[in-house]
Regions:
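Conserved phosphate-binding catalytic cores of ATP/NTP-utilizing and phosphoryl-transfer enzymes
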Residues: 1-2, 198-230, 389-392, 396-397, ...
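Early-domain small/polar-rich strand-loop-helix modules and first-structured segments
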Residues: 1-119, 197, 248-253, 269-281, ...
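Glycine-rich phosphate-binding loop of actin/hexokinase-like ATP-binding domains
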Residues: 18-20, 28-31, 41-44, 51, ...
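Phosphate-binding loop and its immediate beta->loop->alpha context
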Residues: 32-189, 200, 271-316, 324-362, ...
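Phosphate/ATP-binding catalytic cores across multiple sugar-kinase/actin-like superfamilies
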Residues: 141-160, 208-220, 348-402, 421, ...
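Glycine-rich phosphate-binding loops at beta-strand->alpha-helix junctions
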Residues: 168-183, 321-326, 333, 372-377, ...
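Conserved phosphate-binding/catalytic loops in two-lobed NTP-binding clefts
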Residues: 191-204, 373, 422-449
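Acidic low-complexity intrinsically disordered segments
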Residues: 322-394, 461-610
Length: 610
């Protein structure tokens, strides 16, 4: 029996772990309040220290690049002649100078359907002598560090509670589809996690607010409220809507909408500021070497935080060390002034846009290097307008969903000016004053909330009902005469509706369907974050380009009983289920005998095309 629930924020920029002890008392259980684990990590060569977060950066050192003991951790078992991979603060800071050996944004790669996320593709700019690793392996490495940190803490405090035996609540962006979730689960299983549950990050932030508010939360929201969780971290922007209703005389919380996966966050802002500041230098960005460019980005981040924290200051200084032997004497002094900050961040990323202004799509070249699908339009307010417009059915007689409360999460919102810009924009769109709920620690809320969710699942707190964050469809081939060069159209059959609860299954009402067996077949899957009314059995013959997103297809051969059946279509019915981990399983049951075939969405095979 697990003694602790562990909440893990596997973030794009930082990871964190929160824990809460479960204390049996009589025939019931009580729990301690969630706390943050201080994580030992290398912060400099030969220097180890505890930090509340583990930066999500992995550096793969060259042989002999450091003395063997320079990267030691409290739990390290040194291998003679081989340096361990470096994770955390020093990996981020040192690796920024050697970007070809540094892995960052592994989490964003998990959601990138164009590449094989289980193969070695990172670092993307690695030198030829470096063996690349997969986004799954990189994520597993961060989780392994958290596992080892917890096990060391458990042993040092006599808790007898190894990581592998505890209940793990692992967070993912609400916008992660079933494939990205499966890959995250796969990474956790690689490091020995046995008892896992997946939770969406904005929901975790809301749970953290519930913990912080205690019994007062019921006075902060009321029946009919629609709470917008606006979560902007270092790498992503994530939007979620939570509805407050009543059931049996008690307030009930339901996650009713999630947004698409948007690669846009604080890192984009720091880079934009660096380009703006470099324009004031004699030779611009081209006059800086690689280390100076990185230092400029870091300097702009610090200057941004200083100016936002001190509204009376007009300018924050930035110093770049010189090149080569002129490190000190050749230093460059520059700075970020408030006018540039507001022009780049407030007007560039948070413009006062109209409610009908949607994100620009931008032109794409026919050929492109394979990389992360960053948002073309940097205006977060326009992405928010698109999200609310897609869920207009949640508010009567309106062209967009109208939140009545807002909860901020993510380090970007440490700047009150950015919170105020979002609030003023929403007020203008909706014609009403929208109060902000007081947030917990913006950088640690997700981990704390994940641990609280673990307690709520045990009956030790209120739960948010959510279910799956998309409706899912399987492609149906349409019988049509063969025409050279023209593929037959497909229809989309809804098999799992939006918000279907974990642990549930449903018979999918269908017309007569046939399942080809005994020979290779391809199954096409699609998903939507905003088709709220589709139910199991709904068939779509056409849809707008942004309504359904096609997922990686599944290619497999389903077993036939005899050679005569090979290539034949067996009449079937479909049963769909959502596992406790939030993944999708489809069972095709024969209408003529007792046979059934499972379409298990095997991530590794679906991505390699086998």
């Amino acid at each position: 029996m697990a003694k602790f629930v562990l909440g893990i924020d596997l973030g794009t920029t930082n990871c964190a772990l929160a824990y809460a002890e479960i204390v049996p008392e009589g025939g019931e259980s009580k729990a301690s309040a969630p706390q943050i684990l201080q994580i030992p990590q290398v912060v400099g060569a030969g220097e180890c220290a505890d930090r509340p977060v583990l930066p999500s950066f992995l550096y793969i050192p060259r042989d002999g690049e450091f003395q063997e003991e320079a990267l030691d951790l409290p739990w390290t078992a040194p291998v003679e002649g081989k340096l361990p991979w470096l994770v955390g603060t020093f990996a981020r800071d040192y690796g920024a100078k050697v970007p070809g050996r540094l892995i960052s944004s592994a989490k964003s790669w998990l959601s990138h359907g164009v590449v094989d996320r289980s193969s070695g593709i990172l670092p993307t700019t690695a030198p030829e002598d470096l063996q690349k690793i997969s986004p799954v392996q990189a994520s597993a490495t961060y989780l392994a560090h958290l596992r080892d940190a917890w096990n060391q803490y458990s042993a040092a405090n006599g808790l007898d509670a190894v990581f592998e035996d505890q209940e793990i609540f692992l967070t993912v962006p609400a916008s992660f589809d079933t494939v990205a979730r499966d890959l995250t689960i796969q990474a956790a299983r690689q490091i020995g996690a046995k008892h896992m549950t997946i939770l969406e990050e904005p929901q975790a932030a809301f749970y953290a607010w519930l913990v912080q508010s205690g019994d007062q939360w019921r006075k902060s929201v009321s029946v009919g409220d629609l709470v917008l969780v606006c979560d902007i971290g270092g790498g992503t922007s994530d939007f979620t809507l939570i509805q407050v209703s009543e059931e049996d005389g008690s307030l009930k919380l339901d996650r009713v909408a999630v947004g698409d996966h948007i690669l846009l966050g604080g890192d984009n802002m720091d880079l934009a500021l660096a380009h703006a500041v470099s324009a004031t230098l004699k030779d611009g960005m081209e006059g800086l070497d690689a280390n100076q460019k990185i230092a400029l980005v870091h300097g702009c981040r610090a200057a941004k935080e200083q100016l936002f924290a001190n509204p009376g200051e007009k300018k924050a200084g930035i110093t770049l060390l010189g090149k080569g032997s002129r490190v000190i004497g050749g230093s460059i002094k520059t700075g970020l002034d408030r006018a540039t900050l507001e022009q780049v961040i407030l007007n560039g990323f948070f413009p006062e846009s109209a409610p009908d202004e949607m994100p620009a799509r931008g032109r794409r070249l026919g050929l492109t290097e394979i990389g992360l699908p960053y948002a073309v339009d940097p205006a977060i307010t326009r992405h928010l307008a698109q999200f609310l417009s897609r869920h207009s059915s949640l508010s009567k007689e309106s062209t967009m969903a109208s939140p009545t409360k807002i909860l901020f999460n993510g380090g970007v919102f440490e700047a009150s000016a950015l919170r105020q810009r979002i609030i003023s924009t929403l007020n203008r769109w909706t014609g009403q004053e929208i109060p902000a709920l007081p947030a917990a620690d913006l950088n640690l809320a997700v981990a704390l909330g994940a641990a609280q969710y673990g307690l709520a699942k045990r009956g030790l707190g209120v739960r948010i009902r959510g279910g799956v964050n998309r409706s899912y469809y399987i492609g149906l081939e349409t019988p049509a005469p063969a025409v050279p060069g023209v593929l037959p159209p497909i229809k989309a059959l809804c098999v799992v509706p939006l918000s279907m609860e974990e642990g549930c299954q449903t018979d999918v009402p269908t017309p007569d369907l046939g399942l080809y067996i005994g020979e290779p077949a391809e199954f096409r899957f699609l998903a939507s974050t905003h088709r709220r009314d589709d139910q199991p059995g709904t068939i779509l013959e056409r849809w707008a380009a942004d309504e359904l997103v096609e997922l990686p297809s599944l290619k497999t051969t389903l077993e036939a009983q005899s050679p005569d059946e090979v290539g034949q279509a067996v009449p079937i019915r479909i049963v769909a289920s959502v596992t406790e981990l939030g993944t999708i399983e489809l069972s095709c049951k024969s209408r003529i005998d007792e046979r059934q075939w499972s379409l298990e969405y095997n991530v590794r095979k679906s991505e390699s095309g086998q």
